[in-house]
């Protein structure tokens, strides 16, 4: 049936900030939905609090609301905009829960707004654990034995029926939030208590343990005429018990029999029919567990929306699930929608793939001290990489090197080389992020495959493939690299990188009696070894490979296994040789002038969605300027890896080897103008020198200038030459040197390794003993690089600047004043544009210094500078001549496409000929960071120079305090209007908090404080009650927080011991949860914001209307 004409305007709810379990896959799906609806002529109203998304670009929807995603705020937007329909399936669990609340409280009915895509009944039936189980019983599908509870007492009653171990799954949550596996009663009580708090309906499912069973997912699309197709089957290599988001997965499923597949296919379709009885659900995901012992199949859950797996399935097959689901929601049927990849088939054709896709999650346990790197049913990964190959070994090894965590393939686990079998078995029994590598190492150490399968519950088929890789490794170790082309190609077809082959050849040389230093040295010995092994460095292996005329060919993702020609150039590399003839490359590079943009790879803390945003905008700008845009990336969650973001897409790992092969292919036709490495974060920057060495131009700021800014010694010399202030600093290459430099500078100091992103291993050090403790971890992170030591400017105000330069002119795009003090990582600090309290003279000085630095570094494109302001002095902290994570926020606040302007400048255009960049006028935007503390119980939620946030939100309003309040609400840190606040601040903060705190008591808010703070406030006439510190006896402050008696916490500390003493307070507020502030500056702003929200109602306004105020 044709699209619905009774609808004119449709609202889409986004997913909000990037959090563990809900990441940028929803920007991908939301962007597709916006484009699909506008293509059909509908007015689109978008609500999302995340400024780093493509979907919140002002030209993506007709009305864009960057507002908190709560039922109350969305209800106000509905009242104002009066949409005819609401599409809730593109924004993850956040959108579903919000839509369900709006249906329940009568808002949708009141304003005659219809839910499309999935109605409230379907959502409730899928998300409510009891209703879902009853629905499965009704259609004859088995679920694990289970009991539903709404209280701890009910849960304990249900445990008698279910038994231990038990899996706890809270209702209406995502990413396994609040859930877990309980092996004893104490763990059960603990997990159930957390699960009841995490569930918005205070409901948990207590389920029989199916740990160790095989886990499968089916991605299904259904239309309102009951046409159903399976887009993709996905198999988890990790067994049940590890959240699917944390599992290594493959597509299509590789170990199912055809009979099992057909049973699961039919069951998936039956689930969709039962859950979405009267509506076209669009895309849904159904998860199954299969007992390998007896074939028992149970349904685990269903997501009645596009999901993380939907994004993976879309990228794996080329089938745009979110776009198709959106079209189904407005009335189309599958046979009426054209497959964009082929241009010749309808969407009702089930995709067929003739390759293997592997997804591997990326974790950030190193960011969180005391976090146990164990995987459970609660998701902990922060990103993922996807790789495509013609076989599982090729796909797996490509994915491993695409993770960017130092692996070049199926690398050995050094700690287990030569280990006792009992040690290896104990490590295999622990579900850790690197357990697959441990399994491979177990094979190397001689453990039987059957034993490995018994301990890990990995399917024997996967262990057999690992054994094949290891057999090939052993061949190289024994005999060196093959000098015959067919044998060498077979190695490459198994996914071996040149670097991994060099490492294996080096082991071969080592076996011949030489150490690594001798093998990698130069001269006669090295030349002899190279002749014997084929090469012992990556460059030598590459030379040998090229001499044998072995290069990858590129195949296209076409959704139909080459049955129809693919119209969209979406490609992956393979070394697989055909049975007859030579490998055929389907890349077919064009004869146009072209620019290659390198993406950021898998999301991680410090490098996430913001950089993908910049890469996408580079594509948009350069395409508009007449260039063919070529994107290289390996992240399945992102908009940059959508088939229609760039002209050509290579889904490949971001390593020197893989990128150089792509560039070699593209140079065969047309003109390769250059490569952009500025926009993808640290990942592409690391490749700049290798690309430049290959004779390919780097567009924008030169790699030498980037190195100058990162190299502390060279940079300090430049700063001195320009006459700018910098905190006293020094460089140390040993422990003794670090102690000497610290003594010279004076404590406190800020210490960091060089060449990092996200402040990895940065720390504020207050004394020699803490420095001694730190040095060991810092040196590991630094590798060959020195340790950098800076004077720490305590209580200074940090300022971020984003600027664009073209070699002649410099434009300051935004000056962002941080709310937290200097020393807290800029990515973790709240900030305001325009600055909320900086004097005009300081702003002018910052502009002047920005101009000097841009010219001195010969910046062409984007530049980010961090300053610290103390008194009337401006200190330079660091300069990054590249895109920063604040660029999307600045662009949303300003209304100008900063990244697009920068991309055009990098391609040679001048700023004077491009859209003007100016600051917000008449309103303020505040960015706030979002943290994953709840995912890592036991971790101290303290802010530091090391970045820990996973995402961000934006609050925007005509005045600063209300913008800050909105940002807090959007971040899940809603400021209370009443209640009891706890205050405990260091001596240097006491004077400045008196007035703001007194204003709160005037509004009827009650205060409690520790002894020193209480006595000081009382002396200033502020009514306050004293409460015990934790070490002063009970009841103490943590007891009050746990009892729900505290509504907000302000706790500032000075020195290492004070920080340690207050750790229990910070941990308890995360569990409560209670808003808390650990700096006086943030506490003062929060107090002003509470006064503001008590004085006036929260107003909603579209981004377009704010921008029209500014540009009027």
UniProtKB/Swiss-Prot annotation:
Binding of ATP 1, residues: 129, 169, 175-176, 208, 210, 215, 241-243, 287, 301
MGS-like domain mapped to chain residues: 973-1112
Positions contributing to Mn(2+) 4 binding: 878, 880
Cofactor(s) the protein requires to work: Mg(2+); Mn(2+)
Binding site for Mg(2+) 1: 287, 301
EC number(s) reported in the record: 6.3.4.16, 6.3.5.5
Name of the protein in its database record: Carbamoyl phosphate synthase large chain
Species: Zymomonas mobilis subsp. mobilis (strain ATCC 31821 / ZM4 / CP4)
């Amino acid at each position: 049936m044709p699209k619905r004409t009774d609808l004119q305007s449709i609202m889409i709810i986004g997913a909000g900030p990037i959090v563990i379990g809900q990441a940028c896959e929803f920007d991908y799906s939301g962007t597709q939905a916006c484009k699909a609806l506008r293509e059909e002529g509908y007015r689109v109203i978008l609500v999302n609090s995340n400024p780093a998304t493509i979907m919140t670009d002002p030209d993506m929807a007709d009305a864009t609301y960057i507002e908190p995603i709560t039922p109350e705020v969305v209800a106000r937007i509905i009242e104002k905009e009066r949409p005819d329909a609401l599409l809730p399936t593109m924004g993850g669990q956040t959108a579903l829960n919000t839509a369900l609340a709006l249906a329940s409280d009568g808002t949708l009915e009141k304003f005659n707004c219809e839910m499309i895509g999935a109605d409230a009944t379907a959502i409730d039936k899928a998300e409510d654990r009891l209703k879902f189980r009853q629905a499965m019983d009704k259609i004859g599908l088995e679920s694990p034995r289970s009991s539903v509870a709404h209280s701890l007492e009910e849960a304990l009653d249900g445990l008698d029926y279910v038994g231990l171990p038990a899996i706890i799954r809270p209702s209406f949550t995502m990413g396994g939030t609040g859930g877990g596996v309980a092996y004893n009663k104490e763990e059960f009580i603990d997990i159930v208590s957390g699960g009841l708090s995490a569930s918005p309906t205070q409901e948990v499912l207590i389920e029989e343990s199916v740990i160790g069973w095989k886990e499968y997912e089916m991605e299904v699309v259904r239309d309102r005429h009951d046409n159903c197709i399976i887009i993709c089957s996905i198999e988890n290599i990790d067994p049940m018990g590890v959240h699917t988001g944390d599992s290594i997965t493959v597509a299509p499923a590789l170990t199912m029999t055809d009979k099992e597949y057909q049973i699961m296919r039919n069951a998936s379709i039956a689930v969709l029919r039962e859950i979405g009885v009267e509506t076209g659900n669009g895309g849904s995901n159904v998860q199954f567990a299969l007992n390998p012992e007896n074939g028992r199949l149970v349904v685990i859950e269903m997501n009645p929306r596009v999901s993380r797996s939907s994004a993976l399935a879309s990228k794996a097959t080329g089938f745009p699930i979110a776009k198709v689901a959106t079209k189904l929601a407005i009335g189309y049927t599958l046979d009426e929608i054209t497959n964009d990849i082929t241009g010749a088939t309808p969407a009702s054709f089930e995709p067929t793939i003739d390759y293997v896709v592997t997804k591997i999650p990326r974790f950030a346990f190193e960011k969180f001290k005391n976090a146990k790197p164990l995987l459970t049913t609660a998701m902990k990964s922060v990103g993922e990489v996807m790789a495509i190959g013609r076989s599982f070994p090729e796909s797996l090894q490509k994915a491993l090197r695409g993770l960017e965590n130092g692996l070049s393939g199926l690398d050995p686990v050094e700690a287990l080389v030569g280990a006792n079998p009992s040690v290896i078995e104990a490590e295999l029994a622990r579900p850790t992020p690197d357990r697959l590598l441990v399994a491979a190492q177990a094979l190397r150490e001689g453990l039987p495959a059957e034993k490995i399968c018994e301990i890990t519950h990995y399917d024997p088929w996967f262990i057999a493939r690992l054994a094949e890789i290891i057999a090939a490794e052993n061949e190289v170790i024994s005999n060196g690299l093959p000098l015959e082309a067919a044998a060498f190609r077979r190695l490459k077809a198994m996914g071996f990188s040149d670097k991994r082959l060099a490492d294996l050849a080096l082991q071969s040389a080592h076996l011949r009696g030489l150490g690594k230093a001798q093998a990698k040295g130069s001269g006669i010995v090295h030349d002899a070894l190279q002749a014997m092994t084929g090469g012992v460095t990556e460059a030598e292996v590459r030379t040998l490979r090229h001499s044998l005329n072995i290069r990858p060919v590129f195949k296209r993702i076409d959704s139909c296994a080459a049955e129809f020609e693919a119209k969209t150039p979406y490609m992956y590399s393979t070394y697989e040789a055909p049975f007859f003839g030579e490998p055929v490359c389907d890349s077919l590079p064009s004869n146009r002038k072209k620019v290659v943009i390198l993406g950021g790879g898998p999301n991680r803390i410090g490098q996430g969605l913001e950089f993908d945003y910049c890469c996408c905008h580079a594509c948009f700008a350069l395409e508009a300027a007449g260039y063919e845009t070529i994107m290289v990336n390996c992240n399945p969650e992102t908009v940059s890896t959508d088939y229609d973001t760039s002209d050509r897409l290579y889904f490949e790992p971001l390593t020197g080897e893989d990128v150089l092969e792509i560039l070699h292919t593209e140079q065969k036709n047309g003109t390769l103008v250059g490569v952009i490495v500025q926009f993808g974060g640290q990942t592409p920057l690391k490749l700049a020198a290798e690309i430049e060495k290959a004779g390919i131009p780097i567009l924008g700021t030169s790699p030498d200038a980037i190195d100058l800014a990162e190299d502390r010694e060279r940079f300090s010399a430049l700063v001195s030459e320009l006459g700018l202030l910098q905190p006293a600093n020094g460089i140390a290459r040993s422990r003794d040197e670090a102690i000497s430099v610290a003594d010279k500078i004076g404590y406190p100091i800020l210490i960091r390794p060089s060449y990092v992103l996200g402040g990895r291993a940065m720390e504020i050090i207050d004394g020699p003993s803490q420095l001694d403790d730190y040095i060991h971890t810092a040196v590991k992170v630094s590798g060959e690089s020195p340790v950098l030591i800076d004077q720490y400017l305590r209580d200074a105000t940090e300022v971020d600047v984003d600027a664009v330069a073209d070699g002649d002119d410099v434009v300051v795009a935004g000056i962002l004043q941080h709310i937290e003090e200097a020393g807290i990582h800029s990515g973790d600090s709240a900030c305001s544009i325009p600055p909320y309290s900086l004097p005009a003279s300081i702003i002018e000085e910052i502009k002047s210094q920005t101009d000097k630095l841009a010219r001195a570094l010969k910046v062409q494109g984007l530049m980010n500078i961090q300053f610290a302001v103390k008194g009337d002095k401006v200190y330079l902290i660091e300069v990054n001549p590249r895109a920063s994570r604040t660029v999307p926020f600045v662009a949303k606040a300003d209304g100008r496409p900063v990244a697009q302007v920068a991309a055009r400048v990098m391609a040679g255009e001048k700023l004077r000929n491009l859209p003007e960049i100016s600051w917000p006028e008449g309103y303020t935007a505040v960015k706030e960071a979002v943290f994953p503390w709840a995912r890592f119980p036991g971790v101290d939620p303290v802010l530091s120079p090391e970045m820990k946030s996973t995402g961000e939100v934006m609050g925007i309003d005509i005045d600063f305090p209300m913008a800050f309040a909105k940002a807090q609400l959007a971040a899940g840190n809603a400021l209370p209007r009443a209640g009891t606040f706890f205050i405990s601040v260091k001596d240097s903060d006491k004077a400045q908090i008196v007035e703001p705190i007194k204003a709160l008591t005037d509004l009827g808010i009650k205060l409690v404080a520790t002894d020193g703070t209480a006595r000081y406030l009382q002396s200033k006439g502020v009514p306050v009650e004293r409460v015990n510190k934790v070490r002063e006896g009970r009841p103490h402050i943590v007891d009050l927080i746990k009892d729900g008696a505290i509504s907000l916490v302000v706790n500032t500390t000075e020195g290492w011991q004070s920080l340690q003493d207050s750790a229990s307070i910070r941990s308890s507020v995360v569990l409560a949860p209670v808003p808390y502030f650990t700096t006086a500056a943030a506490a003062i702003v929060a107090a002003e914001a509470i006064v503001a929200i008590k004085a006036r109602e929260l107003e909603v306004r579209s981004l377009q209307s704010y921008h029209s105020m500014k540009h009027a």
